[in-house]
Structures are given as structure tokens and as C-alpha cells.
Amino acid sequence: MEVAGAQAGILPLLLRHPASLRGSLSLSCGGARRSWAAAAATAEGGGGEEGRGYERVPMDTPGAYRLVDRATGRSVIVWGGTDDVSMPSPAVLSTTTRVPDRPKENGRSTSIGNFGRLKAQKVKVLARRSAHLKREDSGRISTSRFSESPSDESDEDGTYFERDRARNTRQNSRSRDDKTRGAHSLNSVLRQYRGADDLDFPGSEATSGSKRWGNISDVTFGRQNQRQKGPLDSGFFSRRSFKEIGCSDEILGALRSFGFPRPSHIQAMAYRPVLEGKSCIIGDQSGSGKTLAYLCPVVQNLRKEEVEGLHRSSPRNPRVVVLTPTAELASQVLNNCRSISKSGVPFRSMVATGGFRQKTQLESLDQELDVLIATPGRFLYLLQEGFVQLNNLRCVVLDEVDILYGEESFEQVLHQLITVAPLTTQYLFVTATLPLDIYNKVVETFPDCELIMGPGVHRTSSRLEEILVDCSGDDNEEKNPETAFSNKKSALVKIIEESPVRKTIIFCNKIETCRKVENALRRVDRKASQIKVLPFHAALDQQQRIANIKEFLNKQTADSMFLVCTDRASRGIDFANVNHVVLFDYPRDPSEYVRRVGRTARGASGNGKAFVFAVGKQVSLARRVMERNIKGHPLHDVPCV
């Protein structure tokens, strides 16, 4: 803004226009106090511009002009109001503000303090106005996509969605009851929270004008805007390069062909200890890259031994054994091995699980072998029958170790393995969740294990939106498993109809419930023209399960696919680009909750939503779990590193 009176050495004075601020200040300028009342009287008594004692000089700033005293040349800038408002009145111009006498510094007047206060007031007014305009702009944007759900609708339609009141972390000191609002009906939420973040499918209701869901973080436990800053906010990738963590040129070339710019946090943390042959417990959240965190350094050691002539591949004598809880996870690890091998790091790998022809697997064992991937039962059979020797064994990997320890026969398998394996064998325990009882069992048997815990262990992804759906029903409704299933089914159908996405995983606790959900979904689309229902549980033979998994992971399909499964699908399987996860039945323990919702929002940039159906006491339990997730707290205590 132009400085008035600069040539005369006069301090510029900024005043609110009298049209908007009555009682403006008249301050001394440059140490000489002079009232503008005489000038104003001259202006009112004079006829026309020529007879005035001062004149108004327009400025470029709208609503501002410079008031110049013709007699002395002194001027003041007046800002505010409109350009065509009349001159300040004599009463305004002659008003003075009494200030306490202050000691002078070097003989100069301290009237600058008045100007300072006026300037501070002006800045505060501008700040308030700016904040108000921002709130109005954000309100216009938000109300165009979100509308506040009326409280009376939730009473009419029944309670379905829990609204999170703890979005602002300043409210953390409030009680738990104060952190959540009243529930909203599924109907009202589906009716009001619409947007374009879900996919459109040819021939689906979404393309024919049906309502769709948008970003509904106002009524969800999504952490994109709510989670407190923590280690997870530093991003998926580590700041270190693959070269810095110890990758060989061969492995580095393979990783570059995969398109990875840098290692993930757990890969950067675990690579060097694994490469040095240390036994380790490796833990981080689902989708963090744990498979490559152990596989790449292990394969690098195999290649180093071959180059140095220390060891070579031999039939029925693997140098690495990987045990997994399910055949599907074993197949996934095998695919990773083959991808590395095809990218310029040659080694031989095979899988041995139940459900396949035993003759084919035995024939594969007769060939040269480096890495054997197996389920515990099949591995124990091959070991006891003499089809596998462990003379050359260098490393044992127990993937999803917490699940393995939950199997009755696993400790027998582990004992047999320890008895036969060489004393120098390296053991790697890999998991997304490590309850303290499992940790204690591991360190009791392997006290020298190095503990490597990534930033996301026992935590869900920060890009996951968790939505609590209360399926308890009305208070006067009879409470039994049948009514609970009916309420859940109604909620699921509404989600399918109102929020069409490409891939959804539905978790149930029992095979019987899976079948009931499958039938309900098929009745929604009797012609099977818009949705594809794929079951995945132990009642199916292994070939059918693998076929369904492959179809679900197919990127070319235009169908909206639903994988209806038990916890078998949550055990380490890497599902890419899953949009929604539905917990139709609430999981039995927090670890299973983490594994289930971890099937979406995976990797460096994955996003997804988890719909958690709960009834009765499960509602408060789910709310507490989600509140911990919002704050970034682990669902289990993390073992001390």
C-alpha cells in the first residue's frame, strides 16, 4: 500500500473508514499532535472542492484514499467502506484517544504505541475475516458432497452407523462416550453421502443413475484426516536405497524390474541382519513387503555360496525351507520365487502341499532344488518318509508364525525340524501380528533371535477407512442368531446396491455362514449378470480354491466380484486392488481383525474401506478397537526391541 506523507517524514496512519468503524483514533504523527477538526470544519463550510482545507486523493486499493491537508501537506490514508462514501465527519476526525503517559525514549514521543495497537487490531480483524471466508468456502465445498444427517432419521430407521466424535485430536481428554455420536441409519447414510470415488461398471446400477458412496469420513473411523502424526506418516518406503541396505547387483536388477524405487521400512530394517545369517523375528503390518524382506537376502546368500563354490543345488536336499499355514500362501511365495528367478537371479524352487497329486511333487523333488515351500503337515510327511533330507539346510522361514503356532501339530513339526537340521541353521519368523504368548514361545526355543519390528506391527493401514455397522436391530426386536443374520444381510445388500466396486472380500467365522451369504448374494443378482460370487473355505477342494483366487485376482474382468471366505483368506495372501472388506462376522480376537482388514489398503498407495458388522456387545468392542486405530495405537502390546 502507498505510504502517505513519506516525503514530509510523517508516520503513515491506517484508519478504518468511519462508515464501518465509529470512534476512530486521531493520533499524533511525527510527534506533533494536530486535530483534524479544523480541516473538517473548513471542508463543511467551504463550497466545492476548491474551498476545502483538505482534499481526497484516490488510491489503487479499492475503498482507500489519501486525505491531504492543503495547509501543511500532511496526509493520512483512510481505508474501508466504499469509494463514494462522504468525507469523515468533524466528530470522527476530532476524536482523540487518551493514553497513559509513558516515558519518552531519547526525547521522542511514544504515540507510536497507539498506532501499534491500531495496527494489531486491524491485523486481527483481517485474520478473523480470512478465517471466516475459508470456513465459508470449505462449507460450500463440503456441503456439495456431504450433507449433515438429521438426528431424527436415526431414530426412525434404526441405528447402523457410529459417528466418530474424536476427529479432532484435541478431544482425546474427553471420555469414551463423548468421542462418538449417535448412530445413523444405513438408509440415511446411503441417501446422503454420495460421490464419485467408487468405480462405475458397464451395465451396473451406478451407470444408470443409482446412488453411490463418496468419501464418508464424517461417519467413519477413517484415519486419513484423523490419525495423529506418528511413524506411519513417514510413508511406505524407506529413505535408504537398495544398494545401501546391502543388495547385490543381481538382486538390485530384479527389484528394479519389479518397479520398486526404494525398499519398504521393514525391508530396509531386516535386509542386513538376514544377510548376515542371524535368526530374526520380522514383524510389520499386512502389505508391508515382508515376503521380499526375507526372500531377497536369503536368495542372495544362496547365489553367493554358488559363486564361491561352497554349495550347489541337489535333489531332495533343499537349502531353504519355507513353512506356511495354507497352500494358497505357499503358492504365493512360490510365485515370488519364480519372479525373482526370471529376473536374472537363477535358483530352483517348488511347493509341496496337500490337495495336489503326490506323485507330481515327488517327481519335482528328484530334480535339483534350492527352496522348498510347504505346509507343515506335508513337510512332516516328506521328512518322516525320507523324501527330503536336510543335510544342506541353511535357512528355515516360518511365514505367519502366529498362525502356525495356533495349529495343534505345528510344535511337533518344529521339534522334528530342529532335531534334524544342522546347528548352524538360520531361523526367520515372519508375521503381521505377534501376541506376547507367541513371542515368548519363540524366544524360549530360540533365545538368540534378533527382534525386528516395523512401524506398522499390530496396526492397520493409515489409508484404511473403517466403518462400524451396528446390526443389533431395534430395541423391541427379538435378539437371536436368525435376526442378527437378517440384519447383516440387509446391510450387505444395501452396500452392494449403493456402493458398487470391483472387488469385495466378505469374511465369515463359519463355513455355514459363508454358504448362507453366498446364497443371499446370488438372490440379489439371479441372472449373475452384474456380480460374481466366489467361495473360499476349507469345504472346497484345493484346486477349486486356487481357481477362485485366480479369478478374483484377474484384472481383466468387468464383473463386480465377491470373495466369500473364512479366515483362511486372511493368512498372508496378497490381494491386490481390493476396494472393500466386509467383516460379516466379528472376528474372535484382535489379531484376526488386523489380518482381515489388512486385505485392503495394501502396499505403497493402496486405499480401501472395511465395513465391520457388529451386534450387541460387539459394538462397543469394535468402537474401542477403531478408536485405537484412529490414534495409531497397536491392538496388541509390541515386544520390546
From Swiss-Prot:
Binding site for ATP: 284-291
Domain of life: Eukaryota
Any one Gene Ontology BP term: cellular response to ethylene stimulus
Domain Helicase ATP-binding, residue spans: 271-452
UniProt KW keywords: ATP-binding, Helicase, Hydrolase, Nucleotide-binding, Plant defense, RNA-binding
Catalytic activity reported: ATP + H2O = ADP + phosphate + H(+)
Annotated PROSITE patterns: HELICASE_ATP_BIND_1, HELICASE_CTER, Q_MOTIF
Induction of expression: In leaves after treatment with defense-related signal chemicals such as benzothiadiazole (BTH), salicylic acid (SA), l-aminocyclopropane-1-carboxylic acid (ethylene-precursor), and jasmonic acid (JA). Also up-regulated during incompatible interaction with the blast fungus Magnaporthe grisea.
Domain Helicase C-terminal: 487-641
CDD domains xref list: DEADc, SF2_C_DEAD
Assigned EC number: 3.6.4.13
SUPFAM superfamilies named in the record: P-loop containing nucleoside triphosphate hydrolases (SSF52540)
Bias-annotated ranges (Acidic residues): 150-159
Sequence segments annotated as region (Disordered): 86-115, 129-189, 197-216
A molecular function (GO) term: ATP binding
Family named by the database record: Belongs to the DEAD box helicase family.
Function as written in the Swiss-Prot or TrEMBL entry: Probably involved in resistance to biotic and abiotic stresses. Confers tolerance to oxidative stress and mediates pathogenesis-related (PR) genes expression. Exhibits RNA-dependent ATPase and ATP-dependent RNA helicase activities in vitro.
Recorded domain comment: The Q motif is unique to and characteristic of the DEAD box family of RNA helicases and controls ATP binding and hydrolysis.
Protein name as it appears in the record: DEAD-box ATP-dependent RNA helicase 50
Species, as recorded: Oryza sativa subsp. japonica
